[in-house]
Design a protein with these regions (language model features):
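Short, Lys/Arg-enriched N-terminal segments with co-localized hydrophobic residues
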Residues: 1-18
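Compact, glycine-rich, soluble single-domain proteins
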Residues: 18-95
Length: 95
């Protein structure tokens, strides 16, 4: 509609919808950059985070975090950790 609340506006925009992703461990920052999609090994199963995701805090189990940006894929193995998502900023603390 014209009330500015239509979700279609942001998705049809030519601007790229990227999120900021930061993965940190006790050793320091493992990854800091942009991502269009991030997959996590959650306690109840794997889940994906896409732009405009609702705020979230979730525990992570052993597995692999996978992320994608401009067609390039990356991954980070983890033992345990947690993720916080807020305003297209994904903060991950892992061991």
């Amino acid at each position: 509609g014209r009330n500015g609340k239509s979700k279609a506006i942001g998705r049809t925009s030519k601007l790229k919808m990227d999120m900021k992703l930061e993965i940190v461990s006790p050793d320091g920052i493992l990854f800091e950059g942009e991502a269009e999609r991030v997959s996590f090994p959650g306690m109840a199963g794997s889940f994906d985070i896409l732009p405009h995701h609702a705020p979230l805090i979730a525990a992570l189990r052993q597995g692999t975090i996978q992320y994608e940006h401009d067609g390039k894929k990356g991954e980070q193995a983890i033992k345990i950790g947690f993720v916080e998502v807020k305003d297209d900023y994904i903060s991950v603390c892992i061991e």
